[in-house]
Amino acid sequence: MNYEEALNYIHAVQWAGHKPGLTRTRTLLSALGDPHKQLRFIHVAGTNGKGSTAAMLASCLQAAGYRVGLYTSPFINRFNERIQVNGQQIPDEALVRLVERVKPAADAMTDIPTEFEIITALGMLWFAETKCDIVVLEVGLGGTLDSTNVIDPPECAVITALGMDHVKELGPTLADIASAKAGIIKPGSPVVSYGGVPEADAVIARTAAERHAPLTVVDLSRLTIEDGDLDAVTFDFDGLNGIRLPLIGSYQPRNAATAITALRVLRSRGWNIPDSAIRAGLEQVRWPGRFELLRHSPVFLLDGSHNAHGMRATVQSLRDRFPGQKFVFLLSIMADKGVDEMLALLLPLAGQFVTVAAHTPRAMPAETLAEQIRARGGRAEPASTIEAGVARAVALGGTGPVCALGTLYFSGDVREAFAKLNQ
């Protein structure tokens, strides 16, 4: 098996679909020797900010001298990004070897595992093989029935900002969504919650109390954002002053406050994480595709906001960083997301839209999206490919700012097309 064959196996059609439940993952991991039983975890769930928060946690723990696994989704440029140790992606040859190990176990299962469950097993094998001290484990969808929830009680569970997303799978209210996320809370294991949504906070507090899990809610009253430019945002939080965070979204200091709170909980459990490591980790963190500046002048931004809750934060960042400016938006949206609400947020900042369809069956066709924008009084033109869309958006932008957003699923293609355009 070569690398391409390994990826084809992982992405094979027979694994497609979302099937909640932990039985298949437990069966698969058991056949592989239960590698997750050798590991310790920080488990991260949430609607938005969970990937950024996970990246910050991993960066700080690495700065403190630990060997740190990081499991996230989706990938931006290469599949291997999803499984990292100390910032290094799983090597191609290791991925091939582990797929060859997982394949007979997965093929023998009568209840066929999902693609995500297979990837979770691959991650656990690699983290165990590389002897990670701790793994920052990002939930795929929800919490309770997500395949990552097979782990024993983690060192800490972290629940980031909650909002309305995946309502078909998780339920139509914030309480339903909070209930799914709170499923990662394990008996006696501490939990850190971003908080701020009373309906959701009540569910998390109740679940933590029932499971005797010590709960810490992030105290955002202790957060002061000093200033922000196109290179970093500077903030103070809870005695850590003047931290320059290279993730420039206005919302990122709040994710950092969540990470700091969780790291201090770990410290109280005996982990050696000095404030100097927290500062170094935050000032070195990289997390592509989240309010990421690909070019300073003229500005070209790439952002992965893919639901109304995330889009609201992105729009606020655009207003903060570029007051009074109009954008050319390169936009792709999944048809099952809150399109109306996202467009309502973007239209006041838009000079023009160029619409494209990301390479996934869930993406709204570019022409349909353009029609929806025009129906709301916006100017929009569809592009037949992402490459054509990037070129058109840059041409329309001239010396003004361009922002590509609406889904993480086109981030890699946008980055590639933009790089090609600037060769």
Question: Would you name each region that the model predicts?
Answer:
Residues 407:
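Active-site-proximal loop/hinge segments that shape catalytic or ion-binding/gating pockets
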Residues 38, 134-137, 145-158, 162-163, ...:
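Nucleotide phosphate-binding/pyrophosphate-handling subdomain across enzymes
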Residues 127-133, 269, 320-325, 393-401:
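Glycine-rich phosphate-binding loop signature in dinucleotide/nucleotide-binding domains
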Residues 194-216, 230-234, 299-302, 308, ...:
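C-terminal helical cap/extension that packs against the catalytic core
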Residues 1-48, 52-67, 76-78, 93, ...:
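N-terminal leader/targeting and accessory segments in enzymes
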Residues 183-191, 321-327, 349-354, 398:
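Short, surface-exposed connector motifs at secondary-structure boundaries
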Residues 18, 22, 26-37, 63-152, ...:
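ATP-dependent carboxylate-amine ligase catalytic core
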Residues 110, 118, 131-138, 154-239, ...:
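Acidic, Mg2+-coordinating active-site environments of NTP-dependent enzymes
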